């Protein structure tokens, strides 16, 4: 029997709120989709894991990649948006780079839960979603990305990332409401 975990990646105030330091405008449109995915995961008894950027004020990512400071540990911008707040029993995994696996306890958490399949939502499609999906595939997880539950900085980058994940990595790309077997959930 497959055990799937729902990953909610970087749905933080510094990415979602209007005027935020690294605003991804389309994230606001995916909130209702992610809310439904959370309800579905809870109903199926699947774990929900929030994978969240968490940077030091002088993080090398800002210098190395030219990103503006964002998701600084302890700030409001590093908090999950109110609409998607973690519930008791949900896991929160901080990360300081694009991958949810690199330098984190995500893999250990998944192993302890007996998870073999991941369902990814959040942002940014062509950065943290795609890199986390790649790392998961390389670790032999079955990976599904909810197409209408992820957002990119630009539509063309979002679409390209979905194609690459599907055609190169073997990631399953589905619309929200599709269950682990690929059927449309009731």
Each model region followed by its residue ranges:
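Active-site flanking residues adjacent to catalytic metal/cofactor-binding acidic residues
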Residues: 9, 52, 147
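Short beta-strand segments at enzyme active-site cores
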Residues: 46-53
């Amino acid at each position: 029997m497959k055990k799937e975990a729902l990953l909610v990646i970087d749905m933080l105030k510094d990415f979602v709120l209007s005027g935020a330091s690294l605003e991804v405008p389309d994230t606001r449109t995916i909130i209702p989709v992610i809310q439904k995915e959370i309800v579905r995961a809870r109903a199926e008894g699947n774990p929900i894991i929030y994978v969240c950027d968490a940077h030091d004020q002088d993080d090398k990512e800002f210098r190395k990649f030219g990103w503006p400071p964002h998701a600084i540990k302890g700030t409001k911008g590093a908090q999950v948006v109110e609409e998607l707040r973690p519930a008791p029993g949900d896991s929160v995994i901080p990360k300081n780079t694009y991958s949810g696996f690199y330098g984190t306890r995500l893999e250990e958490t998944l192993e302890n839960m007996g998870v073999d399949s991941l369902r990814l939502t959040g942002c940014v499609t062509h950065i943290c979603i795609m890199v986390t999906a790649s790392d998961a595939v390389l670790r032999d997880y079955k990976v599904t990305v909810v197409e209408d539950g992820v957002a990119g900085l630009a539509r063309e980058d979002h679409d390209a990332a979905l194609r690459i994940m599907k055609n190169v990595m073997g990631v399953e790309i589905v619309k929200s409401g599709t269950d682990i077997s690929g059927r449309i959930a009731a």
